[in-house]
C-alpha cells in the first residue's frame, strides 16, 4: 500500500483541525500548522477520523469492505503524506516565517532613472548616505545577531561606489544575497565577477517592448535589460523579471505582447527565468491611485498573468504555502535601512515610521525591536484574526492597507484590528486552497 508505512503505524495529527464543506469538496484545515488537504467524499472523511482517533493503519485496512473504500484510503494517505499533514509516530514539524531575520537595504537613493511610479522616488543621492565601512559593519553585526537574508536595492545599487565589496562581504559571511536592479549598468566583466556572490537577482522591465517600456523607464533601455537578464540566468543565478505596468502603457494587446516577451526570454536561457507582475500600484513619484482603482488594476493584471499561464495563480499559491510553514504576519518587523541609516520595519518606508538610525544603536537592538513588532502585530495578537482558523494561511494581510493602524504603531491604541476581511474573502481563500490543491496533486491516477 505504501512502502513507508507498516500496518502497526499510527499517524499523529495536530490537535486543532477544522473541516469545511465547500461545494462537493471537504476542506480539512490544520489550524496550528497552516496546512490543509482536500477530501472528495464522506468515505475519506470517515477514514480520516479513524486515523485521528489513533487507529493503526492495519486496523483501518481491516475495516475496509470494498475496492472503492480502499481506493479512497490510498488517496487519503497519499494526500496526508504529500502535504506532511501528519507524522508517523510524531507530530509534523512546524516552521515559521521570521521576517525579523531578513534585512532590506536601500543602499543609495541615487539612480540613473526617474521612473514615474517609483515608490522610493529615487534619483539624487542623499546628503548623508552611509559609507562602505558602515555597511560592512552593519552586515557583520546582522549576521552575528542571527540575520539570514539581505536584499540590496536603491535607487540603483550599482550607483553606490564600493557595492561590489559589500556584495562579496555579505556572501562571504554566509548571508543569502538578493539584488534588485534596473539592469542598465551591468557590464560583461561585472556580471562574470559578481554572479558567484548573488543568490537571486531581480530586474525591472515595465513594458512589453522598447516603446511601452520607454513610457515608464525612458528610451533605449529595454534591450539592454533583456540582455542582462539572459546573461545572469545563463550563469546559474536565480533570475527574475518584475513588471509594474501603469495605465499609461497598458494596451489592448498587452497580454499577447507580454506572453511573447516571456517566451522570447526563456528561449534564450538554459535556466528558468521567473516573471512577476505587480498587482498593486503603490504611491510613487507620479502615481497615487485610490483603492477602488487599484482593485480594477489588480483584476486587469491577473488577467494578463492568466493569459500567459492559466495555472499561474495555483502555482504561486502552492509555492507560497509550503506544508507546515506558518505565516503570522505580512512581514512587518523585517528591517529596512535607508541609505542614510534610518531604520524602518516595512519596506514601504515612506508610509511608516522610523525607529532610529543604525549609527545610534547596534543592529541587535533593531532586530529585537523588529521581533517585538512582528509578534505584537501577528495574527495571534490582532482582532478578529486571533479567532480565525485561517489565520496562519492568510497572515492577516498588509499591515498598511488592511489594518486600522495603517502601518504606524507609535500612537495607536491596542488591540490592533484587521478592517478589510469579509466572509466573502474567507470563502474565496478556501476555494483557492481547494483549487490549488486539486491542480498540484493527483492521487487518482
Model-predicted segments: where are they?
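Short, small/polar residue-rich loop motifs at catalytic or cofactor-binding pockets
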Residues: 328-332
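Canonical Radical SAM [4Fe-4S] cluster-binding loop centered on the CxxxCxxC motif
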Residues: 96-133
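Acidic, low-complexity/disordered tracts enriched in E/D and polar residues
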Residues: 1-50
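C-terminal accessory region of radical SAM enzymes
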Residues: 236, 292-323, 348-390, 394-395, ...
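Flexible glycine/acidic-rich beta-alpha junction loops that bind and position SAM and/or redox cofactors
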Residues: 248-250, 269-295, 313-326, 350-354
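Long, charge-rich, low-complexity alpha-helical segments
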Residues: 39-106
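Local cysteine-cluster metal-coordination motifs and their immediate loop/turn environment
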Residues: 110-120, 345-348, 382-402
Amino acid at each position: 500500500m505504501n512502502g513507508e508505512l507498516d500496518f502497526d503505524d499510527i499517524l499523529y495529527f495536530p490537535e486543532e483541525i477544522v473541516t469545511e464543506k465547500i461545494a462537493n469538496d471537504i476542506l480539512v484545515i490544520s489550524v496550528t500548522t497552516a496546512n490543509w488537504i482536500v477530501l472528495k467524499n464522506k468515505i475519506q472523511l470517515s477514514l480520516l477520523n479513524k486515523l485521528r482517533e489513533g487507529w493503526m493503519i492495519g486496523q483501518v485496512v481491516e475495516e475496509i469492505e470494498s475496492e472503492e473504500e480502499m481506493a479512497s484510503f490510498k488517496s487519503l494517505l497519499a494526500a496526508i503524506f504529500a502535504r506532511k499533514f501528519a507524522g508517523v509516530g510524531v507530530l509534523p514539524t512546524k516552521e515559521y516565517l521570521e521576517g525579523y531575520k531578513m534585512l532590506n537595504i536601500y543602499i543609495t537613493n541615487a539612480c540613473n532613472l526617474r521612473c514615474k511610479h517609483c515608490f522610493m522616488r529615487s534619483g539624487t543621492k542623499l546628503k548623508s548616505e552611509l559609507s562602505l565601512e558602515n555597511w560592512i559593519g552593519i552586515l557583520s553585526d546582522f549576521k552575528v545577531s542571527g540575520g539570514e537574508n539581505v536584499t540590496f536595492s536603491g535607487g540603483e545599487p550599482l550607483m553606490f561606489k564600493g557595492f561590489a565589496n559589500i556584495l562579496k562581504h555579505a556572501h562571504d559571511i554566509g548571508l543569502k544575497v538578493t539584488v534588485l536592479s534596473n539592469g542598465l549598468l551591468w557590464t560583461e566583466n561585472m556580471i562574470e565577477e559578481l554572479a558567484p556572490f548573488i543568490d537571486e537577482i531581480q530586474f525591472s522591465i515595465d513594458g512589453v517592448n522598447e516603446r511601452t517600456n520607454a513610457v515608464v523607464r525612458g528610451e533605449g533601455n529595454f534591450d539592454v535589460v533583456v540582455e542582462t537578464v539572459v546573461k545572469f540566468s545563463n550563469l546559474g543565478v536565480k533570475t527574475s523579471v518584475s513588471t509594474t505596468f501603469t495605465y499609461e502603457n497598458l494596451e489592448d494587446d498587452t497580454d499577447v505582447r507580454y506572453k511573447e516577451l516571456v517566451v522570447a526570454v526563456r528561449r534564450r536561457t538554459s535556466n528558468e527565468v521567473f516573471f512577476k507582475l505587480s498587482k498593486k500600484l503603490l504611491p510613487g513619484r507620479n502615481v497615487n491611485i485610490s483603492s477602488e482603482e487599484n482593485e480594477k488594476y489588480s483584476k486587469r493584471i491577473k488577467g494578463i498573468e492568466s493569459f500567459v499561464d492559466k495555472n499561474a495563480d495555483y502555482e504561486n499559491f502552492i509555492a507560497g504555502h509550503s506544508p507546515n510553514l506558518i505565516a503570522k504576519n505580512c512581514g512587518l518587523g523585517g528591517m529596512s535601512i535607508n541609505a542614510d541609516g534610518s531604520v524602518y520595519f516595512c519596506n514601504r518606508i515612506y508610509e511608516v515610521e522610523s525607529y532610529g538610525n543604525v549609527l545610534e544603536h547596534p543592529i541587535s537592538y533593531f532586530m529585537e525591536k523588529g521581533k517585538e513588532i512582528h509578534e505584537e502585530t501577528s495574527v495571534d495578537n490582532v482582532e478578529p484574526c486571533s479567532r480565525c482558523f485561517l489565520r496562519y494561511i492568510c497572515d492577516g494581510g498588509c499591515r498598511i492597507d488592511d489594518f486600522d493602524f495603517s502601518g504606524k504603531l507609535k500612537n495607536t491604541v491596542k488591540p490592533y484590528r484587521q478592517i478589510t476581511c469579509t466572509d466573502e474573502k474567507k470563502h474565496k481563500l478556501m476555494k483557492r486552497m481547494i483549487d490549488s490543491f486539486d491542480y498540484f496533486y493527483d492521487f487518482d491516477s
